[in-house]
Amino acid sequence: MISQTDRQTDRQTDRQTGYPSIDKPWLKYYSKEAIEAEMPRCSMYEYIRRENENTQENVALNYFGKKITYRELFERIERAAAAFQKRGIENGDVVTIMSMHIPETIECIYALNMIGAVSNLIYMTLSQEEIIAQITAVHSKIFIYLDEAEDRVYGIQDKLSGVTFIRMSSYDSMPYPMKIIGVGKKRYRQKRASIRFKDFVDTCKSTKVDVAEYEKNKDAIIVYSSGTTGNPKGVLHTNDSMNAVAFQYKIAGMGIEKGSTFLNPIPPFFGFGISIGIHTQLSLGTTGILHIVPETNLVSRTIRRMKPDHVVLGPAFLDAMLDSITGDMRWLQTLAGGGGGITEEQERKLNNKLHEHKSKLNYLTGYGMTEFGATVCTNMNRCQKVTSLGIPFPKTNIKIIDAETHEELPYGKTGEMCFHTPNMMKNYLNNPEQTAKTIEIKDGMCWLHTGDLGHVDRDGFVYFDGRIKRIYITRAADGTVYKLFPERIENVLSGCHDVQQAAVVVEEDEIKLNDAVAYVVLKKGSTEKQLAIIRETLAQKLPDYSVPETVMVIESMPLTQSGKIDYCRLPRL
């Protein structure tokens, strides 16, 4: 009999039941102190303040060479908080921010958190209609935007009467002469005047702030899921869920020390960007190297020039990782990534290149979702298995369930991954129906259904096996009906020597069954010989009913804003 009490307890059971959620074999990799540590009970701002109280002269942010200490950052946050309160922002209000991770964005997020307001972080690439919709959905009284988006913001003020527009410049915090060059380039054309953020703060002479008291499960951050099949959903996180990510990184034994440097190229409007790139980075007392131009070659150049101790990147930056591995790499302490994940061949290629350049590290993969803020399981330098997603964090539990019966499955069996974790979202914004479908409350525990397939081995390592939503029904030549897994086909394609990227979509035929169509980006050109080898490999490694009849060569793979393959934009036959 599975004991719900055992499932809720943060300890490894003495007996082996055969079920990961009960046995928790991953806990053997954590210290007793980590397992028993109490979760922080404070706001996001209070947490970074507390964790850096005695090291305020350390550098918090490095922005194009301009270094901002923790003391300076806290002062900037408090001044911005006073300005927001003077402008009428109160506890519980929502302010919409459309910006990159410049210092001003970071101080806005924590200033709003300090006074109990919520930051609604929206994509920089939204259309005018989408901007209006996301501002009005949360009833924002203030809209803060980066001036790089001026062309899209221009003209929407008339449709948002009563909303104050505040513009931020990516140049204001840059060192001279970069600041002078940048300011000279800017021209603003708003119909109604927008307020410059620097003036917004400077005109507020008061530094007195009415700090909001901590409330359990209080709203803090709204980010948006990077869906590939529909409109992104607003994901609401609390102070507790955001702090839980940072705290578990602290107690897990990741080897990230105060004063070390941490490269952050991921914008704050992604869950990973605000949670890991900003909040965890600051909570751990590291120096965040802010890289706001998400171009692969520039990220690679920054890694080589700045030599950050810790580099954590999304799947879109795989080429940057490979390009940045040059010379003696013994300075690197962490190279990690997640998101859409990488193939076994790509992972081994990265590891081999690291080792060739004198590093003892392996590339670390992990697993997370916007709904978790970021990470729920990860490999670590001290604890890893190649091709796995690592182990759950010390305060996190996992169970694998049968997608149809919802019964828990034992070790080694593939099913839907469900997590119980303190960094779980509160809900989907204004979407109780979808929230109820995603978060299951069972025997007093909340389990978030990921929609992803995986399994757990007897050591507690988690493996990704595909996506539940990408399972289709097809029919073999003999008429037998089978399940079709596009992810499996993609893995075979990605293992082909000539294939740089691969994607598979499924199209319905005239009798309502499904056929796979493969899209590939080749490393060099496109020849019939290459395609023949690819088709031969598919035939050798896949059952007949899974082999795509069509393999299309395309020049580049369409990506979502978070760097994942955008299946909706693949050309149709």
Predicted segments, located by residue:
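AMP-binding/adenylate-forming catalytic domain of the ANL superfamily
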Residues: 540-565
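Conserved pre-ATP/AMP-binding loop-to-beta segment of ANL
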Residues: 188-224, 231, 255-261
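Conserved structural elements of the adenylate-forming
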Residues: 74-79, 202, 235-257, 265, ...
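AMP-binding/adenylate-forming catalytic core of the ANL superfamily
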Residues: 126, 133, 145-148, 421, ...
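Conserved AMP-binding/adenylation subdomain of ANL enzymes
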Residues: 243-261, 269-312, 324
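Conserved ATP/PPi-binding loop(s) of AMP-dependent carboxylate-activating enzymes
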Residues: 391-395, 407-438, 467, 479-484
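Conserved AMP-binding/adenylate-forming core of the ANL superfamily
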Residues: 39-40, 57-102, 106-110, 127-132, ...
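Gly/Ser/Thr-rich phosphate-binding loop
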Residues: 165, 309-312, 322-385, 397
